[in-house]
Every structure is written in C-alpha cells, then in structure tokens.
Curated annotation (Swiss-Prot):
It holds the Pfam family Ribosomal_L29. GO terms for biological process: translation. This is Large ribosomal subunit protein uL29. The keyword Ribosomal protein applies. The gene is rpmC. It comes from Photorhabdus laumondii subsp. laumondii (strain DSM 15139 / CIP 105565 / TT01) (Photorhabdus luminescens subsp. laumondii). PROSITE patterns: RIBOSOMAL_L29. It comes from the Bacteria. Belongs to the universal ribosomal protein uL29 family. GO terms for molecular function: structural constituent of ribosome.
Length: 63
C-alpha cells in the first residue's frame, strides 16, 4: 500500500483501513506463534502500513 493511495482516502476510510490492518496483524501474530506462518516478512509490512495510516490520521487531525 502506497502512501499516496492512503492520502487520497478520507478519515473514515483510514480508520476502517487501520482496523483491518490491526486484525490482519493479530492473525499473523497468532500464526507466527503457532508456527504456521511461512512468510514472516508480512508482519513487518503490516506494521509499517499501520504506522503509515496512523501518521496520516494524525496529519489530517492537525490540519
């Protein structure tokens, strides 16, 4: 997910996206804990995407 794509979204869409990413992160962590996660790089990608969304929400709140 690119930052430019996220910038075009509204605050409500960003909040929905954040919720989806947090759920995905939870599922990936559970898979990693049980040894089922083959692609461990997905955890890092999701974490970075969560940071991007949170940053944009903060920017939009201040604007």
């Amino acid at each position: 997910m690119k930052a430019q794509e996220l910038r075009e979204k509204s605050v409500e869409e960003l909040k929905t996206e954040l919720l989806n990413l947090l759920r995905e992160q939870f599922n990936l962590r559970m898979q990693a804990a049980s040894g089922q996660l083959q692609q461990s790089h997905l955890l890092k990608q999701v974490r970075h995407n969560i940071a991007r969304v949170k940053t944009l929400l903060t920017e939009k709140a201040g604007a």
